[in-house]
Each structure stands twice: as C-alpha cells, then as structure tokens.
Amino acid sequence: IPEKVKINDSTFVAGDNFLLKNKQGQWELYVEGNPLQIGKITGSLTQELMQKQEAIFFNKVEDLVPSKTQQYLLRKFLAWYNRKIYLHIPEEYKAEIYGLSQFSSSNFSEIGEPYLRLLYLHGAHDIGHAMQDLMLVGCSSFAVWGDKTEDGELLIGRNFDFYAGDDFAKEKIIAFVNPSEGHKFMSVTWGGMMGVVSGMNDQGLTVTINAGKSEIPLVAKTPISIVTREILQYASTIEEAVAIAKKREVFVSEAIFVG
C-alpha cells in the first residue's frame, strides 16, 4: 500500500487516498482499492482517530461495568456469543476489517486480538440493542418530497442517536469509498468502522438504519451495518437493496430506510 505522508496536522495523503479536515471541521476520507487495500489504507490514514474511538468506547464500557470480575465475565460472554459471527460476514469485509485491524491500539489485548476486537465492535451496536433494547440506539429519520421540498425532489434527513458519550460523537468521518468491485459510495462513519449507518452510492441510492424492538438473539449473526454496507456497494435499485437484505441473517430488528 502507498505510504502515508503528513502534509499538516489535518491533511494526510497515501497515493491517491487522503484524509483531511474540511472548512466545517469535519474529517473527509477518500480511499480506493480492493478490500484488503481499502482496510489497510483506511487504517493507516485514520489510525489516530481509530485508536481514539476504541479507547473512548472501551472506557465507556468500563464506566458502565466497573467491576473487574464482571468485565471478565462480559469478555467471556462476548467471546462465546460472537463465536459464529465470522460465518455471517462476507469474506471481502473480513479482509477489510483485517486490514483495518493492523492499525488498532495495542492497549486492549485482554479484550481480544485486534482483528477479533474489531469484528466484535462491528456487532456492538446490535448486541447493545438486543441486550437492553437500548434506546441508546433509537435513531430517527424522515423523508419528504413533492410540495414539501423546494424543488419537489426527495429529501431524507436523519438523527444518528447511537449514544456512546459526547467524546465518541466528536470525530465523525465522511468517507468516500471507491471499491474495486461494486458502486462507489459515501457514508458518515468514525475511525475503525467499515460498516454503514448512513450513506449514499453513486447510483443515488441512500440507506440509513433505525432500531426496532428485538427479541434477545441466542448467537451473533450479521451486524446490521455490514448489511447496509453491502446494499450501498452492490444495489442500484430499491428492489436490489431488498434482495440483499433478505439474503442475510441479522440478529436484531432494524428498519433499513432505503431511498
């Protein structure tokens, strides 16, 4: 992969790929290549942001579960619960997560090796949702068109209400991804996350996810953000999006809002 070059504190380049802070103070990422390249280049460019999010997330878990014994039991439970998650994630996305994990923090080895830790983190939203029906994850969105918008075209808005603390919400990344297979797409994400919670592809298809009421599942399956990523990358119509969603077994109820 191309080497990362630091231009200044808010601009990093690796070949044709880059990470920069725009005028609005938001991080923008452009990355291209095959799954492993996309993972490694994204990891290289966003390493600081990724390690920061990981620390914030695991510190938040420590706040919620301060007892060392309970933390140990939680780790054992999650390892058991996620034992089959790898069977439900497409190979290309496992390759991308593996590439990303090469740039993970070395501080959380007691939770798991970097690749497994990142795999689990992609299911954290789903597990949290299932365990508490956490309205920690109750996102809201709307769509208007016709005489409700200025130009009559479709307008979709959403609130991203997955709340893991103010610090976690600070460093969002607007990622533009040009994969070797499928459609180019953009999504609003954060360091270490290759799944999609809100995004749009170059076919004009948009997806957002909104939590629904769930039964507690017995074993982890496909994280919802991986399903929405697959939809953005491979669907150009609502029918194709529905077909992709139907072929995946997810482990919590979510409404996937496709426009």
Give the residues covered by each predicted segment.
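Short arginine-rich
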Residues: E249-I256
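Short, well-structured alpha-helical segments that form the helix of a local strand-helix-strand
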Residues: I238-E249
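N-terminal mature-domain region immediately after signal-peptide cleavage
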Residues: I1-E239
